[in-house]
Amino acid sequence: MAKEQGTKPIAQNKKARHDYAIEDKYEAGLVLTGTEVKSLREGRASLAESFITIDRRGEMWLEGANIPEYLNGTWNNHAPKRKRKLLLHAAQIDKLARQTQAKGFTIIPLSLYFKDGRVKVEIALARGKKEFDKRQSLREEQDKREALRAMRYANKQVR
């Protein structure tokens, strides 16, 4: 079987970009079992309500991510919401651990995707947005959409 090329996302955490201001992004590997990979190849995963923790031994874990059981699996299937270990360099984990000690910073998963046949997760160091920040960013997005719509309409009228 040929390796899949490209980085088409399997799952995205859409709410993360709304609730958090992204400061820095990282790419991490993910330790999975065989049935989890097969389930991901079917495109079945959810990062909603998921978060990342760093334990005392300096290991990062993805918690709350839902990878449903593989449909054709046997009794040897995986638990859908188990903790999954993230693979990063020790220096990167130390840096993230120091930065999360600062007030208001957290580490969140943004997306899951295949890269060269391996599952990767895009994680971000982020700061939580206040309610007025969320409203302001929504207003800015709406203004951009309206401006694009007006430009498209003006271009149609010129022709």
Curated annotation (Swiss-Prot):
PANTHER family xrefs = SSRA-BINDING PROTEIN (PTHR30308:SF2), TMRNA-BINDING COMPONENT OF TRANS-TRANSLATION TAGGING COMPLEX (PTHR30308)
Question: What SUPFAM superfamilies does the annotation carry?
Answer: Small protein B (SmpB)
Instruction: Cite the NCBIfam families for this sequence.
Output: PRK05422.1 (NF003843), smpB (TIGR00086)
Mind naming one GO cellular-component term on file for this protein?
A: cytosol
Q: Which Gene3D superfamilies match?
A: 2.40.280.10
Q: Where in the cell is it found?
A: Cytoplasm
- What does the protein in this record do? Required for rescue of stalled ribosomes mediated by trans-translation. Binds to transfer-messenger RNA (tmRNA), required for stable association of tmRNA with ribosomes. tmRNA and SmpB together mimic tRNA shape, replacing the anticodon stem-loop with SmpB. tmRNA is encoded by the ssrA gene; the 2 termini fold to resemble tRNA(Ala) and it encodes a 'tag peptide', a short internal open reading frame. During trans-translation Ala-aminoacylated tmRNA acts like a tRNA, entering the A-site of stalled ribosomes, displacing the stalled mRNA.
Q: Which GO terms describe its biological process?
A: trans-translation
Chief subcellular location equals cytoplasm
Record protein name field: SsrA-binding protein
This protein's UniProt keywords: Cytoplasm, RNA-binding
Molecular function as annotated in GO: RNA binding
Q: Which family does it belong to?
A: Belongs to the SmpB family.
In terms of HAMAP family, this protein maps to: SmpB (MF_00023)
Q: Which organism is it from?
A: Bifidobacterium adolescentis (strain ATCC 15703 / DSM 20083 / NCTC 11814 / E194a)
